[in-house]
Design a protein with these regions (language model features):
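Conserved acid/base catalytic micro-environments in cytosolic active-site loops
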Residues: 2-4, 9-21, 30, 35-36, ...
Length: 366
């Protein structure tokens, strides 16, 4: 796995390079600005580029489209400190083709001492490097003399996907629940846009997207602008209303409380669930208890298995759960876990999920 690091801090470049090497990956280049990174692309051919936003000469936002044009398919992860400005820029970079973002501690000391930052960085290199390797064209083998090549070990058969029978409760949906992580900001926006604002105005939309604080508020603003509906982080005791989009705040679990006809947002700072806070499972468990069969949920692209236990609660309550397919997922962790557990009524490409959800919401599903 080949990695390029572009950051104007020599301390950050050195630390990150050391961590990546210790994890068993190869650092093929480091760059102090976007211009050097761009000039190094053809020579070094990285699988993953870690691209800082704020750099001299050519910053990350300027370099990103040029890097992608020069090396289509390279996996670019944006890095930035937790500010509203950088959150907004990072989300815009995702729309331009970056695969993910990584919140960076504000100081070099913070970078040095943050085990969380190190773990998240290595995990992204591992996941996106593997994704890039799968998509690379395989070169023809060079002509050699008689060489015995050991047979490859047999591949483990893929886990068969068994779809859950369609719910036949006769209870129409009263809300839409969305869980997502890596690759989610783009996916969520596309799904909501394809459902359409006319349909979304009739239902509350509750979203758990794995994101740090600050980013979730900006993410909500982007969604609201895209679909033309009020969208914001959920607030404690805020009443659930149709036509509004509620995003779980970074660093806090978002659930539901009250009775079926008088529901409100519940926020808590409890322990992480599935290594996450906010966690999809927290929202889904509450929705299963309070909406029951009147909930409709979808799990989109993301690492890990968050949402699987909550999806089980929803299906046991009679609700329908859909999942994104592997081919269109940035990472088929969360949706794959739900699909392999037999909890998904349908496993669909991203482009088909919006229309399918619209049909279920409006009662026009086959």
């Amino acid at each position: 796995m080949r990695v390029m690091i572009a950051d104007d801090s020599a301390v950050v470049r050195g630390l990150v390079a050391r961590w990546i090497g210790e994890a068993g990956f190869e650092v093929v280049a480091t760059a102090s600005n976007g211009r050097i990174a761009l000039e190094s692309m053809s020579r070094t051919d990285p699988d993953v580029v870690l691209l800082d936003i704020d750099m001299p000469e050519l910053d990350g936002t300027q370099a990103l489209p040029l890097i992608l044009a020069k090396s289509p398919g390279v996996q670019v992860v944006m890095m930035s400190t937790l500010t509203t400005r950088n959150a907004d820029i990072s989300l815009r970079c995702l729309a331009l083709g970056a695969v993910d973002y990584l919140a960076k501690p504000e100081s070099n000391r913070g970078v040095t001492t943050s085990d969380t930052f190190r773990a998240e960085l290595i995990e992204r290199v591992r996941v996106f490097g593997a994704a890039r390797a799968r998509r690379r064209p395989h070169a023809a083998p060079a002509a050699v003399g008689a060489v015995h090549i050991a047979p490859a070990p047999p591949q483990r058969p893929a886990t068969p996907i068994v779809l859950r029978p369609k719910a036949r409760t006769g209870i129409p949906p009263r809300c839409l629940l969305i869980g997502s992580s890596t690759g989610g900001p783009r996916a969520v926006g596309e799904v909501l846009e394809k459902i359409g604002s006319a349909t979304l105005r009739q239902f509350p939309v509750l979203i758990v997207q794995h994101m740090p604080p600050v980013f979730t508020a900006v993410f909500a603003e982007h969604l609201g602008a895209r679909v033309g509906l009020p969208a914001a982080e959920g607030k404690p005791d805020e009443r659930i209303q149709p036509g509004r989009i509620y995003v779980a705040p970074g660093g806090r679990h978002m659930g539901l409380q009250g009775s079926r006809n008088d529901l409100s947002i519940r926020l808590d700072d409890g322990p992480v669930v599935n290594f996450c806070r906010p966690a999809v499972d927290v929202l889904f468990h509450d929705a299963a208890a309070l909406y029951g069969a009147a909930a409709l949920a979808v799990i989109l692209t993301g690492m890990g298995s968050d949402g699987t236990n909550g999806a089980r609660s929803l299906t046991e309550a009679g609700a329908a759960v859909l999942a994104q397919d592997e081919a269109t997922s940035t990472v088929w962790g969360m949706p794959g876990s739900v699909a392999k557990a037999g909890l998904a009524q349908a496993v669909l490409p991203l482009g088909d999920l919006g229309p399918a959800l619209r049909n279920l919401l409006t009662g026009h599903a086959a």
